[in-house]
A protein has these predicted regions:
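Conserved, well-folded catalytic cores of nucleic-acid-processing
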Residues: 16, 67, 146, 182, ...
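C-terminal-of-GTPase-core extension/linker across diverse P-loop GTPases
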Residues: 18-38, 46-49, 204-267
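Hydrophobic alpha-helical transmembrane segments of membrane transport and translocation systems
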Residues: 353-387
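Membrane-inserting effector segments that mediate pore formation, membrane fusion
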Residues: 257-295, 299-350
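Short acidic, Gly/Ser-rich segments with clustered Asp/Glu that frequently serve as metal-coordination loops
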Residues: 96-104
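Conserved C-terminal guanine-recognition region of P-loop GTPase G domains, centered on the G4
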Residues: 85-88, 107-194
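Canonical P-loop GTPase G-domain recognition
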Residues: 155-156, 164-238
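Conserved G1/Walker A P-loop phosphate-binding module
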Residues: 1-97, 290, 299, 354, ...
Length: 387
């Protein structure tokens, strides 16, 4: 994540907002500050692995990433290990599954957990054959309790069973229920359990790192990705949604961003300050598009954001276009005044944001994104821009 680029954008916005009337300044900053914190306070998720030592976690995380990943097998010490993909973000892992197989000790694990609070536990099992998870559940319970006592936080636990694609759906469901029964059988694990998910992680990567589509047998990986991202604290969600390609979570975060910026633009657009607001609208819309790009997993670049505006048929002064559209409406419908200006600013801003979500997150073509923009309609249930 390019924090400096994001910080520079928000500093520019804050400088422009400082020129607004006092009451409006406060209202705008109240809406923007939570969004600013989501992006500027982002950090890597901290995930603790529990469960079956024989489960292939490299295959599981490779399936989540869509990229071949060889995870470090802890042999001597329990340490947090950071994994990153260039331009995509990263995550941190503490593999606590091998207490009975390696020289890992409780004191070493305790040190790692005391040092940094886990965000999420993944209890992983794998293979077509049934296995005894009694010891894994006992060890997992102790680690979960240790983290809860040290950090006074109840962290979620997701059960994951990785099975061959050749298994029937009924067999898969039976194995998932078996894992869930093991987890519910432990009071401590049961109290933290979010859900159990059955997946198939098998996918072949070519020598160049690309996916062999004819050998892509992944199942339910998208469900697991979104479950992981949603259970993380807010400050770790964007990075996780990016790197694990959790589309539903990406859309939810982006929608929150678009609605907040639209609300602010509606408030700014309604002010009787001729053309003084257009740099603020422009900066807000530009920040919104770069934010959607960031959420989607694209490498953040101001040039790419400007090119997106251009592809929609807008120049960087898009805010001015929306405001001028409002002025034209005022001439035709006397008496409505500035409320139309705010509504048009809101509709235009929402159209830009919705188009950016469709293009960067949903993967539609630029032609389709342009059609969405040209509709310039707010959601029916929305009161955005009604001030």
């Amino acid at each position: 994540m390019n924090h400096q680029t994001l910080l520079a954008i928000y500093q520019r916005i804050e400088a422009l907002i400082a020129k607004l009337p006092g009451p409006l300044q406060n209202a705008v900053m109240k809406e923007l500050n939570p969004i600013k914190q989501i992006f500027l306070s982002q950090r890597l998720a901290r995930i603790v692995l529990l469960g079956d030592p024989g489960a292939d976690v490299s295959a599981l995380f490779s399936a989540l990433l869509g990229s071949d990943l060889r995870m470090v097998d802890p042999q001597q010490d329990a340490n947090w290990i950071t994994y990153e993909l260039k331009g995509k973000g990263g995550f941190r892992v503490l593999d606590a599954r091998r207490l009975n197989e390696t020289s890992l000790t409780w004191s070493a694990l305790a040190g790692a957990i005391v040092d940094q609070s886990p965000d999420l536990f993944l209890f992983i099992a794998g293979g077509a054959k049934q296995i005894d998870l009694a010891l894994a559940c006992e060890q997992g319970s102790r680690l979960v309790e240790m983290a809860e006592q040290r950090h006074q936080a109840k962290v979620g636990l997701i059960g994951v069973i990785d099975l061959p694609a050749s298994m029937s759906s009924s067999e898969v469901e039976n194995r998932r229920l078996e894992l869930q029964a093991w987890l519910h059988g432990s009071p401590k694990l049961s109290g933290h359990l979010v859900k159990s998910v059955a997946v198939c992680s098998f996918v072949r990567f070519r020598v160049d790192g690309s996916i062999d589509l004819e050998r892509d047998e992944r199942r339910n990986i998208d469900v697991l990705a979104d479950t992981i991202a949603r259970e993380l604290p807010e400050e770790a969600q964007v990075e996780a949604a990016r790197i694990f390609r959790a589309k539903k979570t990406q859309s939810d975060i982006a929608q929150k961003l678009v609605r907040s910026v639209t609300t602010v633009c509606a408030a700014v657009g309604v002010q009787p300050i001729p053309l003084a607001d257009f740099p603020i609208l422009t900066a807000l819309q530009f920040a919104m598009v770069t934010g959607v790009m960031q959420i989607s997993g694209r490498e953040l670049g101001l040039k790419a954001a400007a090119e997106f505006f251009g592809a929609l048929g807008l120049n960087i002064g898009a805010g001015m276009v929306f405001r001028e559209g409002a002025r034209a409406a005022v001439k035709l419908i006397p008496g409505w005044g500035n409320a139309i200006s705010g509504g048009v600013a809101a509709a235009g801003t929402y159209a830009v944001g919705r188009s950016a979500m469709a293009y960067f997150i949903e993967g539609v073509s630029m032609a389709e994104a342009r059609k969405l923009f040209n509709r310039r309609k707010l959601p029916k249930s929305s009161k955005l821009g009604s001030s």
